[in-house]
Amino acid sequence: MNWNKGGPGTKRGFGFGGFAISAGKKEEAKLPQQSHSAFGAASSSSGFGKSAPPQLPSFYKIGSKRANFDEENAYFEDEEEDSSNVDLPYIPAENSPTRQQFHSKPADSDSDDDPLEAFMAEVEDQAARDMKRLEEKDKERKNVKGIRDDIEEEDDQEAYFRYMAENPTAGVVQEEEEDNLEYDSDGNPIAPSKKIIDPLPPIDHSEIDYPPFEKNFYNEHEEITNLTPQQLIDLRHKLNLRVSGAAPPRPGSSFAHFGFDEQLMHQIRKSEYTQPTPIQCQGVPVALSGRDMIGIAKTGSGKTAAFIWPMLIHIMDQKELEPGDGPIAVIVCPTRELCQQIHAECKRFGKAYNLRSVAVYGGGSMWEQAKALQEGAEIVVCTPGRLIDHVKKKATNLQRVSYLVFDEADRMFDMGFEYQVRSIASHVRPDRQTLLFSATFRKKIEKLARDILIDPIRVVQGDIGEANEDVTQIVEILHSGPSKWNWLTRRLVEFTSSGSVLLFVTKKANAEELASNLKQEGHNLGLLHGDMDQSERNKVISDFKKKDIPVLVATDVAARGLDIPSIKTVINYDVARDIDTHTHRIGRTGRAGEKGVAYTLLTPKDSNFAGDLVRNLEGANQHVSKELLDLAMQNAWFRKSRFKGGKGKKLNIGGGGLGYRERPGLGSENSDRGNNNNVMSNYEAYKPSTGAMGDRLTAMKAAFQSQYKSHFVAASLSNQKAGTSSAGASGWTSAGSLNSVPTNSAQQGHNSPDNPMTSSTKNIPGFNNSGNISSAPVTYPSIGAQGVNNTASGNNSREGIGGGNGKRERYTENRGGSRHSHGDGGNRHGDGGRHGDGYRYPESGSRHTDGHRHGETRHGGSAGRHGESRGANDGRNGESRKEGFNRENKMDPKVDSSRMDKVDSKTDKTPDGFAVPEPPKRKKSRWDS
């Protein structure tokens, strides 16, 4: 084979010019490349070894790198081929011995080689062996006698101890891990630290002057009043209600019994309520009565609406919020979800009265919540921590809060909010109305209720928080300390005959003295106090349990933890230091379903404790004697905080509002129609709020129409006769509208030489041919001749308007200018005058005739009388002008107020020019109530 055809000196290489390969040898030159495939090694090439020896090293060197690469690929490709061919079935060739063996093999012969089936077979064998062993044990146990199963077997207590030993963390509440981790600038997670919220600092309420407010709005429906005591018991039993407390209101059984107005009832019907739930039947009357309440009911019982509906009526009776005021009602709840849910209910029912609600909870935008609080909201629904944050940052305050609700108090305590809850309650005025709702009534909740509620009514719906009624409490009021001793020695034998007696004394010295005195009387007793050794205590308690000693004299060290069912009588010889200790004392009897009696001996010096005792008895449905109540009333704080009975404030259903605010769209029923100072007394009720209310404009129009019809009354005949001179001389009717001035009288006045209105009637651009004034001036000074100005009222006197033609002409020019500048208001006023003709003055024609008939006399120079009549009718003029401006500005209160000031400011001392300047910012005027 000739590899190089170029001759001597030419370069060897590949290519068409580098070598020539014969047709027979062409395949052999490619064999080395094919030999490095995945199916064979380099040595398998037969043609490579037959090539000429000189060319072998040169050719091998050229392809050395490629050979390396191919060897690597071949190594990995072998693995891929092996792995890919693992699952392929083996099919032997035709007519081969393996093929014959394959066909002769049984189909399930390889099932023994399946590892899963082998494992399952082993498990079944083990189970069979275990069953056989258990059967043998049962046979042995039956043959053996004298073994007690109740001793040998593990009982519940042993199982509990074993479980606690194996699970030391059982019962520990694991803190939930927060998924929302925060990361620093490098992307490393920041370890979450629980935010510690300090409670609000204490506050001295005696330094704050709180305005009084009304709490009681409940007027009992006559159907409920007519119920007999037995029917009342049956109704509560039917509703599955248990009520305790001092004089609880009777429950209602329908919405009509609550006395809600139509606006609230419309929202209730819209929310698809058909009848109140059991907790609402009793809770709404309690809350409407202004009483503090403990509501114990499960979730979903309707307790949210039970405190929202009375809250709306409570808010509507108070003054509107001023800038910087905090909320009137605060609802505190444990979680954000519950906060949003209650907030939605408050908005749904609050829009009936255009009340604003704000939800304040952790996780929300602090800035947005602070902004909403600063804009003003009557209702705040909050979680404790976030409310405290806002109060500390002065975004709001609790000065005006008079309705406080704690919902799901037990969950707040479980979440560790006890101190925050107490600090919020301590920051609200002490005479507030407080409602506490909980699903359970544990000791912590009971203690909180005693601390923050005053004379609460406890309403239990369902089978939660069953009160212990096995203890009967009897209070004996004695004159002095020696009377206690006489009472005890007289009754002690009787008590010991029915069971063991436990005597409680406050001080150790008194306990020892009482024990020694009783021993001298021959009574067998034991003594227990804190200075005794533990062995002595144990011996006394053991003897008392065995009934070896029937009487035990003890201090409060025995009040807690003594569980002796044989105690039938507890005697509080000295009153306890506080009501908590008293509760634990009387709890020593009436245990394990046994009945017991607790006696408490009081003297007149125990009036402080008597108040606590009254509330304790009322909370336990025990009888409170009149003597005990009289003794408690000697205490100033109890007398002040005691709930007041009597009927609630009238709700004015269908008419005016509660107290300071009227219902939207309704006229006031109780304002004084004759007093001009009260004309705008209800104006503040219609100020537009910042909330989005679709029908607010309609309500305002209806409100002003109602005000218009109620405030302006038709003139009587006596007013016409009394104001005859004024009606013609000045063009004002007795109601103060400029609706008719005769043309003839004006002309006569022009011809008369001494008429003070000689040029004014010509120059006034408001007269038309019919004699009606279409554009009325905004302010009218009183006119007098030769100083008769003094006869006008003080509000109407103007400087420099006396006698003299020059001054009269100046008045005429100024008056005309005034009319011209306020022509728009005058046109509207003219509309009001025409409305007056059709609505209030059917006899306007006769009055016009009367004015024409007496025009000469009236215009003949009776300027003094003219001034008097103008002064007398000024109040009505103000009303009529106000009416015109109301119509002009389409019931806009802001424009109304500014124009009202323009109308009413009659003390301008400017000598020349009566044009009213730009209205200043509205200040308090005499129209405000």
Swiss-Prot record:
<dbReference type="GO" id="GO:0003723">
    <property type="term" value="F:RNA binding"/>
</dbReference>
<feature type="short sequence motif" description="DEAD box">
    <location>
        <begin position="407"/>
        <end position="410"/>
    </location>
</feature>
<dbReference type="InterPro" id="IPR011545">
    <property type="entry name" value="DEAD/DEAH_box_helicase_dom"/>
</dbReference>
<comment type="subunit">
    <text>Transient component of the SF3B subcomplex of the 17S U2 SnRNP complex. Interacts (via the C-terminus) with TP53BP2; the interaction is not inhibitied by TP53BP2 ubiquitination and is independent of p53/TP53.</text>
</comment>
<feature type="compositionally biased region" description="Polar residues">
    <location>
        <begin position="738"/>
        <end position="777"/>
    </location>
</feature>
<keyword id="KW-0067">ATP-binding</keyword>
<feature type="modified residue" description="Phosphoserine">
    <location>
        <position position="96"/>
    </location>
</feature>
<feature type="coiled-coil region">
    <location>
        <begin position="116"/>
        <end position="157"/>
    </location>
</feature>
<dbReference type="GO" id="GO:0016607">
    <property type="term" value="C:nuclear speck"/>
</dbReference>
<keyword id="KW-0539">Nucleus</keyword>
<feature type="region of interest" description="Disordered">
    <location>
        <begin position="662"/>
        <end position="682"/>
    </location>
</feature>
<dbReference type="GO" id="GO:0005634">
    <property type="term" value="C:nucleus"/>
</dbReference>
<feature type="cross-link" description="Glycyl lysine isopeptide (Lys-Gly) (interchain with G-Cter in SUMO2)">
    <location>
        <position position="894"/>
    </location>
</feature>
<keyword id="KW-0175">Coiled coil</keyword>
<dbReference type="GO" id="GO:0005829">
    <property type="term" value="C:cytosol"/>
</dbReference>
<comment type="similarity">
    <text>Belongs to the DEAD box helicase family. DDX42 subfamily.</text>
</comment>
<feature type="modified residue" description="Phosphoserine">
    <location>
        <position position="109"/>
    </location>
</feature>
<dbReference type="InterPro" id="IPR000629">
    <property type="entry name" value="RNA-helicase_DEAD-box_CS"/>
</dbReference>
<dbReference type="InterPro" id="IPR014001">
    <property type="entry name" value="Helicase_ATP-bd"/>
</dbReference>
<feature type="modified residue" description="Phosphoserine">
    <location>
        <position position="104"/>
    </location>
</feature>
<feature type="region of interest" description="Disordered">
    <location>
        <begin position="723"/>
        <end position="929"/>
    </location>
</feature>
<dbReference type="GO" id="GO:0008104">
    <property type="term" value="P:protein localization"/>
</dbReference>
<dbReference type="GO" id="GO:0005524">
    <property type="term" value="F:ATP binding"/>
</dbReference>
<feature type="modified residue" description="N6-acetyllysine">
    <location>
        <position position="5"/>
    </location>
</feature>
<feature type="binding site">
    <location>
        <begin position="297"/>
        <end position="304"/>
    </location>
    <ligand>
        <name>ATP</name>
    </ligand>
</feature>
<dbReference type="Pfam" id="PF00270">
    <property type="entry name" value="DEAD"/>
</dbReference>
<feature type="compositionally biased region" description="Low complexity">
    <location>
        <begin position="35"/>
        <end position="52"/>
    </location>
</feature>
<dbReference type="InterPro" id="IPR001650">
    <property type="entry name" value="Helicase_C-like"/>
</dbReference>
<keyword id="KW-0832">Ubl conjugation</keyword>
<dbReference type="GO" id="GO:0042981">
    <property type="term" value="P:regulation of apoptotic process"/>
</dbReference>
<dbReference type="GO" id="GO:0005737">
    <property type="term" value="C:cytoplasm"/>
</dbReference>
<feature type="modified residue" description="Phosphoserine">
    <location>
        <position position="185"/>
    </location>
</feature>
<feature type="short sequence motif" description="Q motif">
    <location>
        <begin position="253"/>
        <end position="281"/>
    </location>
</feature>
<feature type="region of interest" description="Disordered">
    <location>
        <begin position="182"/>
        <end position="203"/>
    </location>
</feature>
<comment type="function">
    <text>ATP-dependent RNA helicase that binds to partially double-stranded RNAs (dsRNAs) in order to unwind RNA secondary structures. Unwinding is promoted in the presence of single-strand binding proteins. Also mediates RNA duplex formation thereby displacing the single-strand RNA binding protein. ATP and ADP modulate its activity: ATP binding and hydrolysis by DDX42 triggers RNA strand separation, whereas the ADP-bound form of the protein triggers annealing of complementary RNA strands.</text>
</comment>
<dbReference type="GO" id="GO:0003724">
    <property type="term" value="F:RNA helicase activity"/>
</dbReference>
<feature type="domain" description="Helicase C-terminal">
    <location>
        <begin position="487"/>
        <end position="632"/>
    </location>
</feature>
<keyword id="KW-0347">Helicase</keyword>
<keyword id="KW-1017">Isopeptide bond</keyword>
<dbReference type="InterPro" id="IPR027417">
    <property type="entry name" value="P-loop_NTPase"/>
</dbReference>
<keyword id="KW-0963">Cytoplasm</keyword>
<feature type="compositionally biased region" description="Polar residues">
    <location>
        <begin position="787"/>
        <end position="798"/>
    </location>
</feature>
